[in-house]
Amino acid sequence: MSTVNNSTVNDTTVQGTASELEALDALAAALGDALSVDPLDLAPLTADKSGHDSRSLPLALVTARSIADVQATLRIASELRIPVVPRGAGTGLAGGAIASAGQLVLSTLAMDRILEVSVADELAVIEPGIINADLNAQLAPSGLWFAPDPASKAIATVGGNIATNAGGLLCAKYGVTREAVLGLKVVLADGRMLELGHRSVKGVTGLDLTALVIGSEGTLGVIVEATVKLRPLPTGAVATIAAYFPDVTAAAAASAAITAAGLRPAAMELLDARSLRSIDRFLGVSLSERGSTLLLVQTDGAASEAEAAAALEVIVGLGGDAELTYDAVVGEELFAIRRAFHPALEAEGTVLIEDVAVPRSALPAMFAAITEIEERYGIPIPTVAHAGDGNLHPNFVYTPGPDGEVPEIIWQAADDMFRAALALGGTLSGEHGIGILKRRWLADELGADQLALQQQIRAVFDPLGILNPGKA
Protein backbone atom coordinates (compact mmCIF):
# COMPACT_ATOMS: atom_id res chain seq x y z
CA MET A 1 0.00 0.00 0.00
CA SER A 2 1.41 3.40 -0.98
CA THR A 3 2.09 5.89 1.80
CA VAL A 4 0.29 9.24 1.49
CA ASN A 5 2.48 12.29 2.06
CA ASN A 6 1.91 16.05 2.14
CA SER A 7 3.63 18.69 0.05
CA THR A 8 3.15 22.26 -1.14
CA VAL A 9 2.75 22.88 -4.88
CA ASN A 10 2.34 26.41 -6.22
CA ASP A 11 1.34 27.61 -2.73
CA THR A 12 -1.30 24.89 -2.30
CA THR A 13 -0.98 21.97 0.12
CA VAL A 14 -1.56 18.62 -1.56
CA GLN A 15 -1.53 14.97 -0.57
CA GLY A 16 -0.21 12.09 -2.62
CA THR A 17 2.12 9.18 -2.94
CA ALA A 18 5.85 9.79 -3.21
CA SER A 19 5.77 9.41 -7.01
CA GLU A 20 2.73 11.70 -7.35
CA LEU A 21 4.39 14.43 -5.30
CA GLU A 22 7.65 13.98 -7.20
CA ALA A 23 5.72 14.38 -10.45
CA LEU A 24 4.00 17.52 -9.19
CA ASP A 25 7.33 19.04 -8.15
CA ALA A 26 8.82 18.25 -11.56
CA LEU A 27 5.78 19.65 -13.39
CA ALA A 28 5.82 22.83 -11.30
CA ALA A 29 9.50 23.32 -12.08
CA ALA A 30 8.99 22.72 -15.81
CA LEU A 31 5.67 24.49 -16.34
CA GLY A 32 5.20 27.04 -13.57
CA ASP A 33 1.67 28.37 -13.33
CA ALA A 34 0.48 26.08 -16.14
CA LEU A 35 0.14 23.51 -13.33
CA SER A 36 -2.78 23.81 -10.91
CA VAL A 37 -3.74 21.74 -7.89
CA ASP A 38 -6.46 24.16 -6.81
CA PRO A 39 -9.63 22.17 -5.99
CA LEU A 40 -11.71 24.86 -7.72
CA ASP A 41 -9.85 24.17 -10.96
CA LEU A 42 -10.01 20.40 -10.50
CA ALA A 43 -13.71 20.07 -9.63
CA PRO A 44 -15.09 20.52 -13.19
CA LEU A 45 -12.72 17.83 -14.50
CA THR A 46 -14.60 14.98 -12.81
CA ALA A 47 -17.48 15.27 -15.31
CA ASP A 48 -18.33 16.02 -18.91
CA LYS A 49 -21.66 16.40 -20.72
CA SER A 50 -22.47 12.69 -20.41
CA GLY A 51 -24.03 13.04 -16.96
CA HIS A 52 -21.34 10.79 -15.47
CA ASP A 53 -19.16 12.10 -12.63
CA SER A 54 -16.15 10.34 -11.11
CA ARG A 55 -16.79 12.16 -7.80
CA SER A 56 -13.07 12.20 -6.98
CA LEU A 57 -10.72 15.08 -7.71
CA PRO A 58 -7.81 14.40 -10.06
CA LEU A 59 -4.24 14.92 -8.95
CA ALA A 60 -3.65 18.11 -10.94
CA LEU A 61 -4.40 20.09 -14.09
CA VAL A 62 -1.85 21.11 -16.69
CA THR A 63 -3.05 23.84 -19.04
CA ALA A 64 -0.67 23.42 -21.95
CA ARG A 65 0.10 26.48 -24.05
CA SER A 66 2.51 24.86 -26.49
CA ILE A 67 3.64 21.55 -27.90
CA ALA A 68 6.67 21.78 -25.61
CA ASP A 69 4.35 21.93 -22.58
CA VAL A 70 2.57 18.77 -23.73
CA GLN A 71 5.86 16.96 -24.32
CA ALA A 72 7.27 17.97 -20.94
CA THR A 73 4.10 16.85 -19.18
CA LEU A 74 4.07 13.44 -20.82
CA ARG A 75 7.78 12.82 -20.28
CA ILE A 76 7.39 13.45 -16.55
CA ALA A 77 4.17 11.44 -16.33
CA SER A 78 5.75 8.54 -18.20
CA GLU A 79 8.87 8.52 -16.04
CA LEU A 80 6.83 8.45 -12.83
CA ARG A 81 3.92 6.31 -14.11
CA ILE A 82 1.27 8.98 -13.58
CA PRO A 83 -1.94 8.39 -15.59
CA VAL A 84 -2.87 11.26 -17.93
CA VAL A 85 -6.33 12.25 -19.16
CA PRO A 86 -6.22 14.49 -22.26
CA ARG A 87 -9.04 17.04 -22.27
CA GLY A 88 -10.43 19.75 -24.52
CA ALA A 89 -13.63 21.58 -23.62
CA GLY A 90 -15.17 18.62 -21.79
CA THR A 91 -18.24 18.48 -24.03
CA GLY A 92 -18.02 14.73 -24.68
CA LEU A 93 -21.04 12.49 -24.15
CA ALA A 94 -19.36 9.19 -23.26
CA GLY A 95 -17.15 10.10 -20.30
CA GLY A 96 -13.95 10.01 -22.35
CA ALA A 97 -12.38 13.10 -20.75
CA ILE A 98 -13.48 12.46 -17.17
CA ALA A 99 -10.65 12.28 -14.61
CA SER A 100 -10.50 10.81 -11.13
CA ALA A 101 -8.15 10.53 -8.15
CA GLY A 102 -4.47 10.09 -8.96
CA GLN A 103 -4.84 11.20 -12.57
CA LEU A 104 -3.27 14.20 -14.26
CA VAL A 105 -5.50 16.19 -16.62
CA LEU A 106 -3.69 17.59 -19.66
CA SER A 107 -5.79 20.37 -21.18
CA THR A 108 -5.11 21.70 -24.68
CA LEU A 109 -7.91 24.27 -24.47
CA ALA A 110 -5.45 27.19 -24.39
CA MET A 111 -3.78 25.99 -27.62
CA ASP A 112 -6.42 27.66 -29.78
CA ARG A 113 -4.70 29.40 -32.69
CA ILE A 114 -5.17 29.11 -36.44
CA LEU A 115 -1.58 28.77 -37.64
CA GLU A 116 -2.25 28.91 -41.38
CA VAL A 117 -5.07 29.14 -43.91
CA SER A 118 -4.32 28.19 -47.52
CA VAL A 119 -7.12 29.26 -49.84
CA ALA A 120 -5.32 27.72 -52.82
CA ASP A 121 -5.05 24.30 -51.15
CA GLU A 122 -8.33 24.59 -49.21
CA LEU A 123 -6.75 23.68 -45.88
CA ALA A 124 -5.99 25.14 -42.48
CA VAL A 125 -3.35 24.29 -39.89
CA ILE A 126 -4.78 24.69 -36.40
CA GLU A 127 -4.08 24.05 -32.76
CA PRO A 128 -6.44 21.58 -31.04
CA GLY A 129 -8.10 23.99 -28.60
CA ILE A 130 -9.86 26.16 -31.15
CA ILE A 131 -13.65 26.00 -30.85
CA ASN A 132 -15.38 24.54 -33.91
CA ALA A 133 -17.71 27.51 -34.43
CA ASP A 134 -14.88 30.01 -33.85
CA LEU A 135 -12.81 28.32 -36.55
CA ASN A 136 -15.62 28.71 -39.06
CA ALA A 137 -16.26 32.32 -38.04
CA GLN A 138 -12.62 33.13 -38.77
CA LEU A 139 -12.66 31.16 -42.04
CA ALA A 140 -15.82 32.80 -43.41
CA PRO A 141 -14.09 35.86 -44.95
CA SER A 142 -12.00 33.42 -47.01
CA GLY A 143 -15.15 31.79 -48.39
CA LEU A 144 -14.19 28.46 -46.80
CA TRP A 145 -15.50 26.32 -43.95
CA PHE A 146 -14.71 23.24 -41.87
CA ALA A 147 -17.65 20.90 -42.46
CA PRO A 148 -17.93 18.73 -39.30
CA ASP A 149 -20.69 20.31 -37.21
CA PRO A 150 -21.48 18.49 -33.96
CA ALA A 151 -24.47 19.86 -32.07
CA SER A 152 -21.94 21.18 -29.53
CA LYS A 153 -20.00 23.14 -32.18
CA ALA A 154 -20.42 26.41 -30.27
CA ILE A 155 -18.52 25.00 -27.27
CA ALA A 156 -16.55 21.96 -28.53
CA THR A 157 -12.93 22.06 -29.66
CA VAL A 158 -11.78 20.78 -33.03
CA GLY A 159 -9.18 18.68 -31.19
CA GLY A 160 -12.02 17.00 -29.32
CA ASN A 161 -13.91 16.55 -32.59
CA ILE A 162 -10.87 14.74 -33.99
CA ALA A 163 -10.30 12.64 -30.87
CA THR A 164 -13.88 11.33 -31.05
CA ASN A 165 -14.33 11.43 -34.85
CA ALA A 166 -17.36 13.63 -34.24
CA GLY A 167 -20.25 13.80 -36.66
CA GLY A 168 -23.15 16.22 -36.64
CA LEU A 169 -26.23 17.33 -38.50
CA LEU A 170 -24.46 17.81 -41.83
CA CYS A 171 -22.31 14.69 -41.95
CA ALA A 172 -24.67 12.67 -44.17
CA LYS A 173 -23.71 15.00 -47.02
CA TYR A 174 -20.35 16.41 -45.95
CA GLY A 175 -18.84 13.56 -43.94
CA VAL A 176 -17.62 13.05 -40.39
CA THR A 177 -14.43 14.52 -38.92
CA ARG A 178 -12.13 11.77 -40.25
CA GLU A 179 -12.97 12.87 -43.81
CA ALA A 180 -11.91 16.44 -43.02
CA VAL A 181 -8.44 15.76 -41.56
CA LEU A 182 -5.32 15.58 -43.72
CA GLY A 183 -2.62 15.38 -41.08
CA LEU A 184 -1.87 15.49 -37.36
CA LYS A 185 0.92 16.18 -34.92
CA VAL A 186 0.54 13.77 -32.01
CA VAL A 187 2.63 13.55 -28.83
CA LEU A 188 3.07 9.99 -27.58
CA ALA A 189 2.98 8.91 -23.94
CA ASP A 190 6.78 9.15 -23.65
CA GLY A 191 6.90 12.70 -25.06
CA ARG A 192 7.99 11.89 -28.62
CA MET A 193 6.06 13.65 -31.37
CA LEU A 194 4.76 12.03 -34.54
CA GLU A 195 3.93 14.03 -37.67
CA LEU A 196 1.22 12.06 -39.45
CA GLY A 197 -0.47 12.50 -42.80
CA HIS A 198 0.20 15.18 -45.38
CA ARG A 199 -1.03 18.41 -46.96
CA SER A 200 -1.84 16.82 -50.30
CA VAL A 201 -5.33 15.64 -51.27
CA LYS A 202 -4.01 12.13 -51.90
CA GLY A 203 -1.40 10.08 -50.05
CA VAL A 204 -0.98 6.34 -49.51
CA THR A 205 2.53 6.04 -48.08
CA GLY A 206 2.65 3.44 -45.31
CA LEU A 207 -0.10 2.61 -42.85
CA ASP A 208 -2.71 5.32 -42.31
CA LEU A 209 -1.84 6.24 -38.74
CA THR A 210 -3.71 9.53 -39.10
CA ALA A 211 -6.98 7.67 -39.49
CA LEU A 212 -6.05 5.38 -36.58
CA VAL A 213 -5.52 8.29 -34.19
CA ILE A 214 -8.77 10.00 -35.24
CA GLY A 215 -11.47 8.64 -32.96
CA SER A 216 -8.99 7.04 -30.54
CA GLU A 217 -10.30 9.18 -27.66
CA GLY A 218 -6.92 10.16 -26.23
CA THR A 219 -5.72 6.57 -25.79
CA LEU A 220 -2.93 6.61 -28.40
CA GLY A 221 -1.49 10.09 -28.00
CA VAL A 222 -2.31 13.77 -27.51
CA ILE A 223 -3.24 15.74 -30.61
CA VAL A 224 -1.32 19.02 -30.64
CA GLU A 225 -1.82 20.24 -34.22
CA ALA A 226 -4.07 19.37 -37.15
CA THR A 227 -4.08 20.06 -40.86
CA VAL A 228 -7.75 20.09 -41.79
CA LYS A 229 -9.52 20.02 -45.12
CA LEU A 230 -11.75 22.99 -45.94
CA ARG A 231 -14.63 23.36 -48.39
CA PRO A 232 -15.98 26.35 -50.29
CA LEU A 233 -19.03 27.78 -48.55
CA PRO A 234 -22.18 26.41 -50.22
CA THR A 235 -23.81 28.70 -52.77
CA GLY A 236 -27.43 29.03 -53.78
CA ALA A 237 -30.63 29.00 -51.77
CA VAL A 238 -31.02 26.99 -48.59
CA ALA A 239 -34.38 25.21 -48.46
CA THR A 240 -35.93 23.85 -45.26
CA ILE A 241 -38.85 21.43 -44.98
CA ALA A 242 -40.76 20.85 -41.75
CA ALA A 243 -42.88 17.71 -42.05
CA TYR A 244 -45.19 16.31 -39.37
CA PHE A 245 -46.20 12.65 -39.32
CA PRO A 246 -48.75 10.69 -37.27
CA ASP A 247 -46.07 8.33 -35.91
CA VAL A 248 -42.32 7.85 -35.83
CA THR A 249 -42.36 4.80 -38.09
CA ALA A 250 -43.94 6.80 -40.91
CA ALA A 251 -41.42 9.61 -40.50
CA ALA A 252 -38.50 7.16 -40.45
CA ALA A 253 -39.86 5.48 -43.58
CA ALA A 254 -40.03 8.88 -45.30
CA SER A 255 -36.42 9.69 -44.41
CA ALA A 256 -35.30 6.29 -45.74
CA ALA A 257 -37.30 6.90 -48.93
CA ILE A 258 -35.62 10.27 -49.47
CA THR A 259 -32.22 8.58 -49.30
CA ALA A 260 -33.37 5.70 -51.52
CA ALA A 261 -34.48 8.28 -54.11
CA GLY A 262 -30.85 9.35 -54.49
CA LEU A 263 -31.31 12.67 -52.68
CA ARG A 264 -28.62 13.95 -50.32
CA PRO A 265 -29.99 16.68 -48.07
CA ALA A 266 -27.43 18.67 -46.10
CA ALA A 267 -29.35 17.76 -42.95
CA MET A 268 -32.26 15.48 -42.14
CA GLU A 269 -33.35 15.36 -38.50
CA LEU A 270 -36.15 13.34 -36.92
CA LEU A 271 -37.76 14.08 -33.54
CA ASP A 272 -40.18 11.59 -32.00
CA ALA A 273 -43.34 12.30 -29.99
CA ARG A 274 -41.66 12.32 -26.57
CA SER A 275 -39.00 14.69 -27.88
CA LEU A 276 -41.59 17.13 -29.22
CA ARG A 277 -43.50 17.12 -25.94
CA SER A 278 -40.31 17.88 -23.98
CA ILE A 279 -39.47 20.72 -26.35
CA ASP A 280 -43.04 22.04 -26.06
CA ARG A 281 -42.66 22.22 -22.28
CA PHE A 282 -39.19 23.77 -22.49
CA LEU A 283 -39.93 26.42 -25.12
CA GLY A 284 -43.59 27.02 -24.29
CA VAL A 285 -44.74 26.02 -27.78
CA SER A 286 -47.22 23.47 -29.15
CA LEU A 287 -45.39 21.51 -31.84
CA SER A 288 -46.93 18.19 -30.84
CA GLU A 289 -50.43 19.45 -31.68
CA ARG A 290 -49.43 19.43 -35.37
CA GLY A 291 -48.23 15.82 -35.38
CA SER A 292 -46.54 13.25 -33.18
CA THR A 293 -43.23 13.25 -35.09
CA LEU A 294 -41.28 16.01 -36.85
CA LEU A 295 -38.92 15.45 -39.78
CA LEU A 296 -36.69 18.40 -40.70
CA VAL A 297 -35.00 18.36 -44.10
CA GLN A 298 -32.56 21.00 -45.33
CA THR A 299 -30.92 21.23 -48.75
CA ASP A 300 -28.14 23.53 -49.91
CA GLY A 301 -25.86 24.16 -52.89
CA ALA A 302 -26.62 24.61 -56.56
CA ALA A 303 -29.19 21.80 -56.67
CA SER A 304 -30.95 22.87 -53.47
CA GLU A 305 -34.30 23.85 -55.00
CA ALA A 306 -34.61 20.73 -57.15
CA GLU A 307 -33.64 18.46 -54.23
CA ALA A 308 -36.09 20.18 -51.90
CA ALA A 309 -38.94 19.80 -54.40
CA ALA A 310 -38.15 16.11 -54.86
CA ALA A 311 -37.91 15.51 -51.10
CA LEU A 312 -41.20 17.32 -50.55
CA GLU A 313 -42.87 15.08 -53.12
CA VAL A 314 -41.63 11.97 -51.30
CA ILE A 315 -42.79 13.30 -47.93
CA VAL A 316 -46.28 14.27 -49.07
CA GLY A 317 -46.64 10.98 -50.90
CA LEU A 318 -46.02 9.15 -47.62
CA GLY A 319 -48.54 11.14 -45.61
CA GLY A 320 -46.43 13.98 -44.25
CA ASP A 321 -47.99 17.35 -43.40
CA ALA A 322 -45.19 19.49 -44.80
CA GLU A 323 -44.16 23.09 -45.41
CA LEU A 324 -41.20 24.28 -47.51
CA THR A 325 -39.42 27.57 -46.88
CA TYR A 326 -36.49 29.38 -48.47
CA ASP A 327 -36.44 31.97 -45.69
CA ALA A 328 -33.10 31.58 -43.91
CA VAL A 329 -34.45 32.98 -40.65
CA VAL A 330 -37.37 30.56 -40.60
CA GLY A 331 -35.04 27.69 -41.48
CA GLU A 332 -32.76 28.60 -38.59
CA GLU A 333 -35.74 28.79 -36.23
CA LEU A 334 -36.83 25.29 -37.27
CA PHE A 335 -33.39 23.81 -36.61
CA ALA A 336 -33.23 25.72 -33.32
CA ILE A 337 -36.10 23.42 -32.29
CA ARG A 338 -33.82 20.44 -32.86
CA ARG A 339 -30.98 22.06 -30.92
CA ALA A 340 -33.35 22.71 -28.00
CA PHE A 341 -33.86 18.98 -27.50
CA HIS A 342 -31.02 18.26 -25.07
CA PRO A 343 -31.50 21.43 -23.00
CA ALA A 344 -35.18 20.46 -22.76
CA LEU A 345 -34.30 17.02 -21.37
CA GLU A 346 -31.69 18.42 -18.99
CA ALA A 347 -34.44 20.57 -17.49
CA GLU A 348 -36.30 17.36 -16.60
CA GLY A 349 -33.52 15.39 -14.91
CA THR A 350 -30.15 13.72 -15.44
CA VAL A 351 -29.78 12.52 -19.02
CA LEU A 352 -27.96 9.49 -20.40
CA ILE A 353 -27.54 10.20 -24.11
CA GLU A 354 -27.00 7.17 -26.30
CA ASP A 355 -25.70 7.06 -29.82
CA VAL A 356 -26.54 3.94 -31.81
CA ALA A 357 -26.42 3.92 -35.61
CA VAL A 358 -28.03 1.53 -38.08
CA PRO A 359 -28.22 1.28 -41.87
CA ARG A 360 -30.56 4.02 -43.08
CA SER A 361 -33.06 1.49 -44.40
CA ALA A 362 -33.27 0.03 -40.87
CA LEU A 363 -34.35 3.29 -39.19
CA PRO A 364 -38.03 2.29 -38.98
CA ALA A 365 -37.08 -1.06 -37.43
CA MET A 366 -34.79 0.60 -34.87
CA PHE A 367 -37.48 3.07 -33.83
CA ALA A 368 -39.89 0.13 -33.48
CA ALA A 369 -37.34 -1.65 -31.26
CA ILE A 370 -37.00 1.43 -29.04
CA THR A 371 -40.79 1.56 -28.64
CA GLU A 372 -40.80 -2.12 -27.61
CA ILE A 373 -38.04 -1.45 -25.05
CA GLU A 374 -40.01 1.49 -23.62
CA GLU A 375 -43.02 -0.78 -23.15
CA ARG A 376 -40.94 -3.66 -21.75
CA TYR A 377 -39.32 -1.57 -19.00
CA GLY A 378 -42.01 1.07 -18.52
CA ILE A 379 -39.60 3.96 -19.07
CA PRO A 380 -39.74 6.77 -21.65
CA ILE A 381 -36.89 6.96 -24.19
CA PRO A 382 -37.23 10.25 -26.10
CA THR A 383 -35.28 9.84 -29.33
CA VAL A 384 -33.97 12.08 -32.08
CA ALA A 385 -32.05 10.94 -35.12
CA HIS A 386 -29.69 12.21 -37.77
CA ALA A 387 -31.98 10.45 -40.20
CA GLY A 388 -29.75 11.13 -43.18
CA ASP A 389 -27.10 8.72 -41.90
CA GLY A 390 -29.05 6.39 -39.59
CA ASN A 391 -27.60 7.75 -36.34
CA LEU A 392 -30.11 7.75 -33.45
CA HIS A 393 -29.84 9.43 -30.06
CA PRO A 394 -32.14 7.60 -27.63
CA ASN A 395 -32.15 9.41 -24.28
CA PHE A 396 -32.81 8.15 -20.78
CA VAL A 397 -33.92 10.77 -18.24
CA TYR A 398 -33.47 9.52 -14.68
CA THR A 399 -32.87 10.41 -11.05
CA PRO A 400 -29.35 9.33 -9.98
CA GLY A 401 -28.83 7.02 -7.02
CA PRO A 402 -27.24 8.18 -3.74
CA ASP A 403 -23.73 7.95 -5.19
CA GLY A 404 -24.70 9.37 -8.56
CA GLU A 405 -25.08 5.96 -10.17
CA VAL A 406 -27.36 5.24 -13.10
CA PRO A 407 -30.30 3.01 -12.03
CA GLU A 408 -29.85 -0.60 -13.11
CA ILE A 409 -33.12 -0.61 -15.05
CA ILE A 410 -31.67 2.07 -17.33
CA TRP A 411 -28.64 -0.10 -18.09
CA GLN A 412 -30.89 -3.09 -18.75
CA ALA A 413 -32.92 -1.07 -21.25
CA ALA A 414 -29.72 0.28 -22.82
CA ASP A 415 -28.39 -3.27 -23.13
CA ASP A 416 -31.50 -4.31 -25.08
CA MET A 417 -31.19 -1.23 -27.26
CA PHE A 418 -27.54 -1.90 -28.12
CA ARG A 419 -28.32 -5.50 -28.98
CA ALA A 420 -31.18 -4.37 -31.22
CA ALA A 421 -28.87 -1.98 -33.09
CA LEU A 422 -26.21 -4.67 -33.57
CA ALA A 423 -28.83 -7.15 -34.79
CA LEU A 424 -29.83 -4.64 -37.48
CA GLY A 425 -26.25 -4.37 -38.72
CA GLY A 426 -25.52 -1.23 -36.72
CA THR A 427 -23.07 -0.01 -34.10
CA LEU A 428 -22.93 1.05 -30.45
CA SER A 429 -21.73 4.54 -31.32
CA GLY A 430 -22.19 6.61 -34.44
CA GLU A 431 -20.33 9.71 -33.27
CA HIS A 432 -19.99 10.11 -29.48
CA GLY A 433 -17.37 7.44 -28.88
CA ILE A 434 -17.09 4.71 -26.25
CA GLY A 435 -15.38 6.46 -23.33
CA ILE A 436 -16.40 5.01 -19.98
CA LEU A 437 -20.09 4.55 -20.56
CA LYS A 438 -20.11 1.97 -23.36
CA ARG A 439 -17.01 -0.08 -22.55
CA ARG A 440 -19.00 -3.00 -21.17
CA TRP A 441 -20.55 -3.59 -24.62
CA LEU A 442 -17.39 -3.19 -26.69
CA ALA A 443 -16.74 -6.94 -27.01
CA ASP A 444 -20.33 -7.50 -28.16
CA GLU A 445 -19.63 -5.51 -31.31
CA LEU A 446 -15.93 -6.15 -31.90
CA GLY A 447 -15.59 -9.77 -30.81
CA ALA A 448 -12.73 -11.15 -28.72
CA ASP A 449 -10.10 -11.26 -31.47
CA GLN A 450 -10.61 -7.72 -32.72
CA LEU A 451 -10.77 -6.35 -29.18
CA ALA A 452 -7.49 -8.08 -28.29
CA LEU A 453 -5.85 -6.69 -31.43
CA GLN A 454 -6.99 -3.16 -30.56
CA GLN A 455 -5.53 -3.55 -27.07
CA GLN A 456 -2.23 -4.69 -28.59
CA ILE A 457 -2.16 -1.66 -30.90
CA ARG A 458 -2.81 0.60 -27.94
CA ALA A 459 0.12 -0.98 -26.08
CA VAL A 460 2.45 -0.21 -29.01
CA PHE A 461 1.63 3.50 -28.72
CA ASP A 462 1.49 3.55 -24.92
CA PRO A 463 3.42 0.60 -23.40
CA LEU A 464 2.93 1.78 -19.83
CA GLY A 465 -0.81 2.33 -20.25
CA ILE A 466 -0.80 5.85 -18.82
CA LEU A 467 -3.00 7.52 -21.47
CA ASN A 468 -6.67 7.74 -20.56
CA PRO A 469 -6.77 4.49 -18.58
CA GLY A 470 -10.14 2.82 -18.16
CA LYS A 471 -11.47 4.35 -21.36
CA ALA A 472 -12.42 2.82 -24.75
Describe these PLM feature segments.
Residues 1-472:
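Noncatalytic alpha-helical scaffold of FAD-dependent oxidoreductases
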